[in-house]
Curated annotation (Swiss-Prot):
Gene Ontology CC, one term: chloroplast thylakoid membrane
Subunit structure: PSII is composed of 1 copy each of membrane proteins PsbA, PsbB, PsbC, PsbD, PsbE, PsbF, PsbH, PsbI, PsbJ, PsbK, PsbL, PsbM, PsbT, PsbX, PsbY, PsbZ, Psb30/Ycf12, at least 3 peripheral proteins of the oxygen-evolving complex and a large number of cofactors. It forms dimeric complexes.
Name under which the protein is recorded: Photosystem II reaction center protein Y
Transmembrane segments: 5-23
Organism: Gracilaria tenuistipitata var. liui
Length: 34
């Protein structure tokens, strides 16, 4: 595994997981308020 690839992928993965977490949290709130 190339270390440069990891350095590039890490922020992308972090941003993607953060976005998914936020979307899931908002979806749960919408689902509860129904």
């Amino acid at each position: 595994m190339d270390i440069r690839l990891l350095i590039v992928l890490l922020p992308v993965l972090a941003a993607a997981s953060w976005a998914l977490y936020n979307i899931g949290r908002v979806a749960l709130q919408q689902f509860r308020s129904m």
